Every structure is written in structure tokens, then in C-alpha cells.
From Swiss-Prot:
Posttranslational mods: Ubiquitinated by FBXL22, leading to proteasomal degradation.
Binding-site residues, Ca(2+) 2: 802, 804, 808
Annotated segments matching region Actin-binding: 1-254
UniProt organism field: Mus musculus
Protein location: Cytoplasm, Myofibril, Sarcomere, Z line
Protein name as it appears in the record: Alpha-actinin-2
Gene responsible for this protein: Actn2
Calponin-homology (CH) domain: residues covered: 38-142, 151-257
Amino acid sequence: MNQIEPGVQYNYVYDEDEYMIQEEEWDRDLLLDPAWEKQQRKTFTAWCNSHLRKAGTQIENIEEDFRNGLKLMLLLEVISGERLPKPDRGKMRFHKIANVNKALDYIASKGVKLVSIGAEEIVDGNVKMTLGMIWTIILRFAIQDISVEETSAKEGLLLWCQRKTAPYRNVNIQNFHTSWKDGLGLCALIHRHRPDLIDYSKLNKDDPIGNINLAMEIAEKHLDIPKMLDAEDIVNTPKPDERAIMTYVSCFYHAFAGAEQAETAANRICKVLAVNQENERLMEEYERLASELLEWIRRTIPWLENRTPEKTMQAMQKKLEDFRDYRRKHKPPKVQEKCQLEINFNTLQTKLRISNRPAFMPSEGKMVSDIAGAWQRLEQAEKGYEEWLLNEIRRLERLEHLAEKFRQKASTHETWAYGKEQILLQKDYESASLTEVRALLRKHEAFESDLAAHQDRVEQIAAIAQELNELDYHDAVNVNDRCQKICDQWDRLGTLTQKRREALERTEKLLETIDQLHLEFAKRAAPFNNWMEGAMEDLQDMFIVHSIEEIQSLITAHEQFKATLPEADGERQSILAIQNEVEKVIQSYSIRISSSNPYSTVTMDELRNKWDKVKQLVPVRDQSLQEELARQHANERLRRQFAAQANAIGPWIQNKMEEIARSSIQITGALEDQMNQLKQYEHNIINYKNNIDKLEGDHQLIQEALVFDNKHTNYTMEHIRVGWELLLTTIARTINEVETQILTRDAKGITQEQMNEFRASFNHFDRRKNGLMDHEDFRACLISMGYDLGEAEFARIMTLVDPNGQGTVTFQSFIDFMTRETADTDTAEQVIASFRILASDKPYILAEELRRELPPDQAQYCIKRMPPYSGPGSVPGALDYTAFSSALYGESDL
């Protein structure tokens, strides 16, 4: 173990300066108030012992017991749960200093910076330094991690105390000194978390010592928090020591933080009222569902119409995922709600007609047509949104590829150009020998060759930067700045190159010998080196392909490149042979010059390393291309798999639509048979849902693989979704229409033959075959059935069959009209006669009579809606059942 030299001191300052002490604060602490020192001794000793007892030991004198560093290291191991280095067991001073330094090293490793605390002061028993060190340990291991609403540790602990004691009288915690002198704050903290331990109402603000002692005794006995404070010291000190109180209060924080004939009449009234109540419930349910659906559409349309592009691929992928969630999770329930809303509306209107009630008119803006219009606007907003997202992702993908390519080429050029200006500015030729000047000239010629070889790269960098600007790359400013710097530097290099050549040519006449081997090496090595750099760039170049043909093209190009490697290796061997010849000449003639080539910056090691790098990159490129080829084959399989399913599902949906359409207009057979057939259709359709789900899964795989086209099918997932939703809506609506016809037939007493006759007449005059007759078709139908109609009579009939003024007559309205005069339905007169029986022939009825004869809820319904009776013989509490009955059938304004 290395010895720790005496005199080593730690000069660290903890980064969290909002609650860690600064060096100047330590200077002031050297003049610590004796009362504060006493409080800190007691508190810090108790705090240390509360942890040391877990290891079966304790301290008596804080500045003496830590001097050898053993218990200090043990304390740190207990509170951190980590092992410290093995202590030195000797008793000499340097052993003690070494142990204390190990403890201080561990504290510093936790990010704590100790100001002016050296191991010598601790070993010497300096009480100020010892207390400061223990306070630093308390801050790091007991207080630092306390955080409330992103506050610092001290502020977080204070805020925690303020919140916990806020409801208590006479408690106002503003600091960690004077706010705790009366002891009520400590008692309030205990009572807030353990009200069974203390009766706060019996505490006396004028007995601070008793309050503090009570709190500390309870904390020690029930909360395992040792006594760390002296009540008399806190009460009698004008400003108690803040560190002592913070240490003690933090123990509370850690302790507490871890811490679902008349009878016949009554039956008739109950039946009528039940129908009315159910109709009102359906009306309210329709209004509620319509409001919720319209509100959802209103909130969704702006989101779908937002075409603001994001700057990053991750953000656009998040938008695409949100849209997928909308199509998979949010929209399908709303499609069902819209369908259910139409079914409820038709059912309600049928029930109202059957029960001889007025037609239901939804509130303004909530008609079925209004909802259909809003839904159409939603579909219009949704159209093209996904295509826009995918186009944006392709654009960003292209941008990222170009940006990475720009960075690679720019980095390569900057690396090459680094230091070139300084080289060109040198005037070494002024003091060089004739041979050296000629060497400098040849070296400059090689540099010019290298410079010309880099011209293409600079042009490529500028072209890529221009394309990034045209595609609106989000970091175009930095790209332009970097490109401009490269171009400016390139211009300076050109100017400096020309000037240096002119200077060298002025001295060329002084040159007598040329080292042909060096010059030949320079001329051949520079292009070869540049070729290798270009080859490495090409081998590391990123590629993006979307088809097997594209990747095959890249593989072909790569194979062509590999075919050139033998020729390149021959060139490399020739260049190496030149250098070997140079070495041979130098050795043969004992020439005292460096074997380094004065005309070229390219070294043999550089050529070897780059050649090795090229050979390493070739198989890596092979693997990348083969992996991409495999991925493109997988994408092609996904396309074919999706197309096979879509080409089967699309015609199946169309066939089902045609079968349902034929079933809805058939004349022969009973309605129940037609219903059973439709139910079978519905069952088959529901069972077919698994095919749609599987297609959705394949479609998601295609999108996750970023496959953007599929030449194997004309069906897209959007076509299938729209067809499937239309099929579900059509079968549900058709079943509802047949159920309504059965309900009307049974309620009106129509035979199956009559129903078939009505259907035949309706189908004959339904010229557009859309289940509706306009006014002229309806008039022709009535005339064909023997009705002699004038304009007034026809207008009256139209108000019955087209109450909403839509200009069309449905099959259900046609049946209602044909059976209206002969059907056995209840009337207002029948209900009035029933009420008269319950009222014992009186023109009014009393609430008591209603409660006696009717069920409680329907009796209360009548009492709430019947107007007071004011006719002859009226008595207090008399109710007008005549007006009420007329209102039920829309014959009054009640």
C-alpha cells in the first residue's frame, strides 16, 4: 500500500453550492460560537452513534475518537453500504493520517469537495475541522438527496417541514434555528405522522423545554431517533446552531418518508307512461351521444388538418405512431357510436310512430344529417394525412443521409487540409541548400497534384450543402457555415500554392540534381493515397435502397470495385519497390541524409495502414450489402403476403355488400326468414374480422419496414378499412330496417301477404332503387292503389309520411300510412277514459289517488307533469289529467 505523505490536504468544493458551504464560510466557522460548538458536538456525536451502533460500537469524544481514522472509515461504510480500502493498523502518526486520507478520498469520490480540511487537522484533534468534516458527511449522506419540487436539499427539507406543520397552531417554520426554539415544530412533525404518540392540543407554547424533551423522548422511544439536542441549549441560545437542528430534523424526514276495473285502467296508464319514459330516455341518450360524437369530431379535425412538418425523424415517427393509434384505437369505437346513433334514431322514430306520438326532432345541429356531414368532413381531413406523414419521413431520411455524407466528406477534407496553410507560408527555401530547394520544389509539385485530386471532394461538399439547403434541412445554417469555411480555405490554399510555386521556381536554376526515386514515389504515392482515401470513403458510404434491383446494382458496383484490387495491389507493390530502392541507394553509397521523402507527406506506414484498412472494409461492405439484400427480399415477401390477403378480402367485402342489397329488396318469404338470413350474414361478417385483423398486422409490418409501394395489388389498407366499415354499417342498418318492419307489422296487425304486397308496390315505384320514393313517385303509387287525391289531401298525407320535410318517403313511413286507419292503437281519448275511472268520474284527479293506483315512479312522473285543474268543482291539489293525456299524443302545448 502506498504511504500517504504528511501535509496532504484536500481542497475540493462541492458543486451544489446552493446548500454546500464555500471556502470563506469555512473561514468564518473557525470562529464558531462556543454555544453552537457545544450543540454541534452533542448533535453530531449522537448522529454518528446512531449509525455506528449498527456496527456494534460508538464514540464518546468526537474529536478524539476519529483521530486514528478507523471509526471514521467504519462510519462511512455503515452509512454508504460500501466497502472502503483496508485501513492501516499501525499506531504511528503516518498510519493515522493514511486512514483519515482514505476516508477523505472516499468522501471526495462522491462528488464532495472539502475545503481546507487536511488529514493532519483530524489526527491532531482539531475540533473545528472535525465538526466541519462530520457536517459535510451529514450533508452528503443524510440531506443531499432530500428534494421537494426540484428544490435544493436544504430548501427541500425546509419546505417539507413547512408543509407538514402548516395546519398546526403556533407553528411557523421559516428557518433551522429560531423556528424550533419552542419545541412545537418537532411535536407537530410527530403528531402529523403519528397522532397516536402525542396529544398536540395539550402542549403549551410557554413550556419550550418540556415540548423539546417530550418530542425527543418520543422520537427515541418510538421512532428510533436518538437524542441529539439539549433542550436548554436550544431555548437559551439566541440563535441555535442551524447544522445541529438540520441534522436532527433530517432524521425525522428519513423516519417518516419511508412511512370504495281500476286495475285495468292502471295497467293501461302504466303502459303508456312506460312508453313515454322510454322514449324520453332514448331522446336524451341520442342527444348525449350526438353531442359527444360531434365534440370528438370537432377536436379531431384540426389535428388531422395540421400538416406542420417536424425537423427530426423521431418526431415524425411519433406523429405516424399517433395516427396509427388513432386508426386502431380511437376511430373504430366512434364508427360504432355513429352507427349505433343512427340505429337508435330510427328505432326511436319507429316507436314514436307505433305509439302514435309526434316524431322526434333533435336539437339544432344534431340531426343525423348533421352528424353525417361532420363525419364526412372528418374523413376528408383524414384523407391523405398518412401519405403526407410517410412522404415527410422519406424526406427526412434523405436529409439525414445527405447530412451524414456531408459530415464525413467535410471531416475527411478538414483532416487533410489541417496545417496545409502553415506549410505553404513557410520560407524554408530561403536558407536551404540547392538540393533542399529542388526537393522543396518537387514536394510542392506533389502537393499540387494532391491539391488537384481534392478538387472533386470540395465540389462534392458544396453540392451536398446546396442540396441540403434546397431540401430545407433544419441545421442548414451550420452546414452552410462549415461549407463556406472549407471553400474559403480552399481558395486560400490555391492562392498560397501559386505564390509558393513562384518563389520556388525562382530558385529552380540553382538545383543540379533531382532525386528521381523520391519524385517518382511522390507522384505515384499521392494519387494512390488519394485513391485509397476515396476507396475508404466509398466503402463506408451509407446507402438507402427500396428495391431488390437497387441493392443488386450496388452489389454489382462493389464486385467491379473488388475486381480492380489486384491492379491496385500491383501499383502499391511498385510504390513500395521505389522506396526500397531509395533505401538501397542510401545504404549503397552511404549517403548521410534522411531516408524520408522530402517531396511527399505520404509515408510507407500510411500506405500500408490505409491499404490494410481498405482490405478490412471490403468484407464489411460485402456483409452490409448482403444484409440489405436479405432485407429487400423480406420486404418483397411482405408485399406479396399483403397482396394475397387484400386481393381476397376486397372482392369478399364487395360480394357481401351485393348480397345484403339483394336481400333488403326481396319480396317473397316472411320477414323473420329475411331477418334470419341477415343475422347469418352478420355472423359471417363478424367471424371474418380475424382476416381484417391479420391484414392490419401485415400492413403494420410493411409500414414498420418502410415499404412504400406494392405493385402486386390495387387494394390499399385504406380501401379495405373503408369497405369493412361500410359493410358493418350496412348490415347493421339493414337488420334494423327489417326489425322495424316486423315491429310495425305486429303492432298494426298486418299479414305477411299484405307486407309483401306493400313491398312490391314500393319497389315498383322506387325508381332509383335506393329505398326511397320522392313526392311524384309516392303520388303515382297511391293513385295505382285506388286513392283519389287532391292537392290538399296529398299535402296532408305528405306531412304524415315525411314529417321532417326531407322530400322522400321511406318504406317504413309508407307502411305506417297504409295501416294507420285500420290499426288498433291507443289514443288520447282512451287514456283520458282510464284516468276518469281512477278518479271516480271526477274531471280531475288527486296525487293520493295516483300514488294509490300506479307504481311509485310512474305516479311521481304524472304528478310532476300534470298541470293544476282550474275547472268547475276544483279542490286544492286537483290535477288536470285531460290536458296531460292530450300532451302525451301531441294534441296540446303542455
